A protein has these predicted regions:
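Domain-length accessory/inserted modules outside core catalytic folds
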Residues: 2-128
Length: 128
């Protein structure tokens, strides 16, 4: 029996996003984010942002990306497509769109009671 795979846009702290293909199993998806998964849907496109369920609260996870006022993500996360009942491959055009949006890694500095985001522009361009 052929194993099913899923291709996602992987986003790690201090790295550019990249496409990654893994087995389409709960265990493989959990391994990519380092724990139990949770999905959020911050955009109108048919994609999910999948992260560690506890990632926002674990102090030992590095800050990764600022998505919007409600989504400061810690640790690894990935973006995948949405199928009828499950996650699916991220479509190529959406992989390009979100690779461009999240291309620059970010650093976070605590300032007063909040966080300041510094984008790490190395001059490279998305290749997804």
């Amino acid at each position: 029996m052929e194993k099913k795979t899923i291709t996602v846009l992987m986003v790690e702290p201090h790295r550019h996003p990249y496409l990654k293909t893994v087995e389409h199993t709960l265990e493989s998806l959990q391994a990519m984010v380092g724990g139990y998964i949770t999905a959020t849907y911050p955009w109108e496109d048919p994609v999910a942002l999948v992260a560690d369920d506890d990632g926002l609260y674990k102090q030992d996870y590095e800050w990764n990306r600022y998505i919007d006022d409600y989504h400061f993500i810690r640790g690894n996360f990935f973006i995948c497509g949405l199928g009828r009942e499950d996650f699916c491959d991220i479509p190529a055009e959406l992989a390009r769109k979100y690779a461009e949006m999240l291309w620059m890694p970010e650093s976070f500095i605590k300032v007063g009671g909040g966080l300041m985001v510094i984008r790490e522009d190395d001059g490279s361009k998305p290749y997804v």
